[in-house]
Amino acid sequence: MNTTTTSSSTDVRDTILATGQRIMGAKGFSAVGLNEVLTAAGVPKGSFYHYFASKEAFGEALLADYFTTYLADMDRLFRQPGQAKAQQLDAYFSAWQESQSFEDCQGKCLAVKLGAEVADLSASMRAALKHGTAGIIDRLARALQAGAEDGSLSFTGTPEALAQSLYQLWLGASIMVKIVRNAQPFDTALHTTRQLLHPSR
């Protein structure tokens, strides 16, 4: 195998995905043509189908790549030494507020932007969204459980149910931020989150 060729091919694919994430994170999936992505990526138009079978397959890969990176970032945050889980969870939601800007999220709000749009358009993209969001909720649930065990958190109900409620709260806040064009929904979500978690002082 020619490792140089393989590496170059992977680099081109990654460039297309990163460019698509940035553009579609701002404009949505349906509104963006492949030519716009490829031109911005500096990739010849005829080479797209060497990497992706269709625009739908590209969208599925886009979401899979997005969630892989997102979940890895969550894992790094929740493995930070010397921090109680309450601190780590607070840092996670504070980072959410900072990254999901209504002005320009630079592709970091892809799940929010594409969630409602593609769920009814593509079964494979909906499955990628379902799998990715399940991974987020699972990590939140494990962090909540660990917080209860280390004594930094106190909450009612199961960690799984609370994790799902918190994710839905913040997903809704992300949509409202885009509607009202200010950060107030995030401020409310963070206040509600802290009330639900009863962090130890």
Predicted regions and their residues:
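Short alpha-helical elements of helix-turn-helix
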Residues: 14, 18, 109-112
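Hydrophobic alpha-helical connector segments
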Residues: 61, 65, 75-107, 159-166
